[in-house]
């Protein structure tokens, strides 16, 4: 009996101990709220350096975070709280900006309104909405530090609100991203709208994601999580976030 206990004790000593400083794996919380006002949260450990709002695209599969979960979990590991507003219950079925604002406001309250910069990233329709959202976030007392617009879509002014960019804070940094196998029409439209509103050109950068090897830089490449997506999409967002901390 004593010999068995001693053997167990020695085995326990030989096993690697868990590091007390190791952060827990990112955990999705929610959805909180109802209908188009619903949202999901992820919390950085031990405390956030930034809050990132992730605006999704126009598709049934985008109404929950699973298309972007790898990118979101990467952001959490980098020290960001993340908010994923649902903003609609069917594609183009709700006033996207209104429900985004409601979801973001209640999410920030749930997070305790951390006194850190807020960055918005959006994909496809959400890429355009991300810039428009930054222009109306003053309504919930938020001054966004930066926006990354990934493969933004064009505006259908018959169905969607036309946002006046004159309220977009001139301190906000904008990064508009296009792909070499995707239409740049949405980014060009955003640039024209920004110029008309006299937004400072020096606060706007553009980047092109390039096809490389088996990586095809088309509209759906933002849903990938391989090495090229990480290098050409994840890393630029990481740098943008770091620049406003």
Predicted regions and their residues:
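Short, surface-exposed "cap/lid" segments of acyl-processing enzymes
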Residues: 45-75
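N-terminal cap/lid segment of alpha/beta-hydrolase-fold proteins
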Residues: 18-47
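Conserved alpha/beta-hydrolase
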Residues: 72-91
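Alpha/beta-hydrolase active-site loop
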Residues: 91-112, 132
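Bacterial N-terminal signal peptides
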Residues: 5-14
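The feature captures the conserved acid-bearing segment of alpha/beta-hydrolase catalytic domains
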Residues: 145-213
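Primarily recognizes the serine-hydrolase "nucleophile elbow" in alpha/beta-hydrolase
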Residues: 109, 115-169
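C-terminal catalytic histidine-bearing segment of alpha/beta-hydrolase fold enzymes
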Residues: 201-245
């Amino acid at each position: 009996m004593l010999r068995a206990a001693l053997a167990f004790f020695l085995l326990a000593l030989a096993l690697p101990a868990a590091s007390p400083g190791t952060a827990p794996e990112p955990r999705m919380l929610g959805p909180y709220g109802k209908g188009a006002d619903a949202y999901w949260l992820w919390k950085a450990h031990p405390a956030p350096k930034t809050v990132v709002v992730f605006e999704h695209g126009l598709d049934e599969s985008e109404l929950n975070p699973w298309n972007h979960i790898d990118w979101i979990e990467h952001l959490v590991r980098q020290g960001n709280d993340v908010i994923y507003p649902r903003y609609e219950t069917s594609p183009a079925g709700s006033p996207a900006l209104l429900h985004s604002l409601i979801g973001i406001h209640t999410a920030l309250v749930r997070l305790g309104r951390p006194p850190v910069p807020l960055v918005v990233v959006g994909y496809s329709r959400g890429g355009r909405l991300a810039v428009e959202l930054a222009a109306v976030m003053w309504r919930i007392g938020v001054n966004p530090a930066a926006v990354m617009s990934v493969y933004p879509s064009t505006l259908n002014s018959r169905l969607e609100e036309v946002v006046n960019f004159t309220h977009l804070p001139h301190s906000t940094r904008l990064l508009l991203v296009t792909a070499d196998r995707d239409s740049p029409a949405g980014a060009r439209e955003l640039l024209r709208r920004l110029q008309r509103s006299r937004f400072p050109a020096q606060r706007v950068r553009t980047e092109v994601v390039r096809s490389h090897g088996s990586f095809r830089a088309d509209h759906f490449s933002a849903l990938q999580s391989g090495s090229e997506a990480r290098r050409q999409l994840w890393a630029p967002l990481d740098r943008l976030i770091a620049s406003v901390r």
